């Protein structure tokens, strides 16, 4: 642990089109090899497509999708006397968002549509309706935590 002062978190600049910090973070998650403009094009195209299909506002769809993918508990490995236990722990809000975004992008990359924008739009629509691969991932994590509830007293 550092003995000096705790370094504060950097302020993230909101994205240029919708002026949303959440969307700016999502763009950074999508971005590969530092190609931010490409990531922005993909996200904006995906949001436009999803908005057309569902008939709702862009940010409402994104927020609904992320809400349905955010985990509330996860398991962490903890060694106790030679054996390793999967201990269920609550997820901090910042990590919840990060995991939700990461899972949404991973699920979109595995889909079969032609372009990444269409894949992401499809996954966001699925997630906003509480179905799809990203939501399944969240359910699996929650199920794992529920199964290991007996080890909750090992929490640290």
Swiss-Prot record:
InterPro entries: Ribosomal_uS7 (IPR000235), Ribosomal_uS7_bac/org-type (IPR005717), Ribosomal_uS7_CS (IPR020606), Ribosomal_uS7_dom (IPR023798), Ribosomal_uS7_dom_sf (IPR036823). Keywords: Ribonucleoprotein, Ribosomal protein, RNA-binding, rRNA-binding, tRNA-binding. It comes from Shewanella piezotolerans (strain WP3 / JCM 13877). One of its GO terms (biological process) is translation. One of its GO terms (molecular function) is rRNA binding. CDD domains: uS7_Bacteria (cd14869). NCBIfam families: rpsG_bact (TIGR01029). One of the primary rRNA binding proteins, it binds directly to 16S rRNA where it nucleates assembly of the head domain of the 30S subunit. Is located at the subunit interface close to the decoding center, probably blocks exit of the E-site tRNA. One of its GO terms (cellular component) is small ribosomal subunit. The keyword RNA-binding applies. This is Small ribosomal subunit protein uS7. It holds the Pfam family Ribosomal_S7. Part of the 30S ribosomal subunit. Contacts proteins S9 and S11. Belongs to the universal ribosomal protein uS7 family. The keyword Transcription regulation does not apply.
């Amino acid at each position: 642990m550092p003995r000096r002062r705790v370094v504060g978190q950097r302020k993230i600049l909101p994205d240029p089109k919708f002026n949303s910090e959440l969307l700016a973070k999502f763009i950074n998650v999508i971005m590969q090899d530092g190609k931010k403009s490409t990531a922005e094009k993909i996200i904006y195209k995906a949001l436009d497509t999803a908005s057309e299909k569902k008939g709702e506002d862009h940010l409402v769809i994104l927020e609904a999708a992320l809400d349905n993918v955010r985990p509330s508990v996860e398991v962490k490995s903890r060694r106790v006397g030679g054996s390793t236990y999967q201990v269920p722990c609550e997820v901090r809000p910042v990590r919840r968002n990060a995991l939700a975004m990461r899972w949404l992008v991973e699920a979109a990359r595995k889909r079969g549509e032609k372009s990444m924008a269409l894949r992401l739009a499809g996954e966001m629509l699925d997630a906003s309706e509480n179905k799809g691969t990203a939501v399944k991932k969240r359910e699996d994590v929650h199920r794992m935590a529920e199964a290991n509830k007996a080890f909750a007293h090992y929490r640290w």
